[in-house]
């Protein structure tokens, strides 16, 4: 590979970043995968697989490992950031002085800025300026299935149509990976954050033993909360019926590959928050997302009762069963009401 002709540089060598890098490389593209831990990158290079997260998926020959950030960023104008939401801004500030003048940035991070609840587009603009094209990909994707080449579909939104077209061409694979373009930059970002919160609630419900009816009701009312918040932020309501909304919500709320769902199940079974996080052993994005989504809802005056009760469990010590009973005890209302 020429030092500057990779199709994509992927920042973040966890399970999802690795899966996306494998998918791009499998499409015939030269891809550079960077991780912050040189020892981890050396292990990936030696094993030619991510043994910790994706042990059965060998790296294509066109996937190149890199531990030097400057070298990784020089390799491609297209940068795909796949890091936890709470370090998203920090990573962007770190890469900004090393990016090529023609750089374009896309992220697969799902969430909002820690503490402030800001959309990641605002974090990116603040860190990188107004001239860099931005994009986001989101949707129902478990890393293990994506890396294995099982059929998967996502949404893609961008501030720049040329960048959106280029990304769709890079990522889309007719055999296994469908990429739907969507002009709703806000909605595609928001869906991925809110679904993490609702998935914790779905897990709690199942952990308590409330059954399939309750889980389905929670998913449906969670979608209503997502849509209300989206409308307040100027998103297109139709987005939440697509991959980045309903698609991701159903996947994360119903399958135990979801860390957020498993975390919620442990809470529903009586485990405390810290012990549940430790047992998961990886980042549970929904834990922080709950606080951030609640902050955003308060800022825009949007009532989100499910999110509020999950917040009470995670941050105020409320019992999961008590939180569920609070929701069940709410006053009767029209299903289509705004609260």
Curated annotation (Swiss-Prot):
Family, similarity comment: Belongs to the NAD-dependent glycerol-3-phosphate dehydrogenase family.
UniProtKB keywords: Cytoplasm, Lipid biosynthesis, Lipid metabolism, NAD, NADP, Nucleotide-binding, Oxidoreductase, Phospholipid biosynthesis, Phospholipid metabolism
Its EC number(s): 1.1.1.94
GO CC annotation: cytosol
Pathway the protein acts in: Membrane lipid metabolism; glycerophospholipid metabolism
Keyword Secreted: no
Protein's UniProt name: Glycerol-3-phosphate dehydrogenase [NAD(P)+]
Record GO terms (molecular function): glycerol-3-phosphate dehydrogenase [NAD(P)+] activity; NAD binding
Residue pairs linked by disulfide bridges in the UniProt entry: none
Gene: gpsA
HAMAP family cross-referenced by the UniProt entry: NAD_Glyc3P_dehydrog
Pfam family, one: NAD_Gly3P_dh_C
């Amino acid at each position: 590979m020429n030092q500057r002709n990779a199709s994509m540089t992927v920042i973040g060598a966890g399970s999802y970043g690795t899966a996306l890098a494998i998918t791009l490389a499998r499409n015939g593209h030269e891809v550079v995968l960077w991780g912050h831990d040189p020892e981890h990158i050396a292990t990936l290079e030696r094993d030619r697989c991510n043994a910790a997260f994706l042990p059965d998926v060998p790296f294509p020959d066109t996937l190149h490992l890199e531990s030097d950030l400057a070298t990784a960023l020089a390799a491609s104008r297209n940068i795909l950031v796949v890091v936890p939401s709470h370090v998203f801004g920090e990573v962007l500030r770190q890469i900004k002085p090393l990016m090529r003048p023609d750089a374009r940035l896309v992220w697969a991070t799902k969430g909002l800025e820690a503490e402030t609840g800001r959309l990641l587009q605002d974090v990116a603009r603040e860190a990188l300026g107004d001239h860099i094209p931005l994009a986001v990909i989101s949707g129902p994707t478990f890393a293990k299935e994506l890396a294995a080449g099982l059929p998967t579909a996502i949404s893609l939104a961008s501030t720049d149509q040329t960048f959106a077209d280029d990304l769709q061409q890079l990522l889309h694979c007719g055999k296994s990976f469908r990429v739907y373009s969507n002009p709703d930059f806000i909605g595609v970002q928001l869906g991925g954050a809110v679904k993490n919160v609702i998935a914790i609630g779905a897990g709690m419900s199942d952990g308590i033993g409330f059954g399939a009816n309750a889980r389905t009701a929670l998913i449906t009312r969670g979608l209503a909360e997502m849509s209300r918040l989206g409308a307040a932020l100027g998103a297109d309501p139709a987005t939440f019926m697509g991959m980045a909304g309903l698609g991701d919500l159903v996947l994360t709320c119903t399958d135990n590959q979801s860390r957020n769902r498993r975390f919620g199940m442990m809470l529903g079974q009586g485990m405390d928050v810290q012990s549940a996080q430790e047992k998961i052993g990886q980042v549970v994005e929904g834990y922080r997302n709950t606080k951030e989504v609640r902050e955003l809802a308060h800022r825009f005056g949007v009532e989100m009762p499910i999110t509020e009760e999950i917040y009470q469990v995670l941050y105020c010590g409320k019992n999961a069963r008590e939180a569920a009973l609070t929701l069940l005890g709410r006053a009767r209302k029209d299903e289509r009401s705004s609260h």
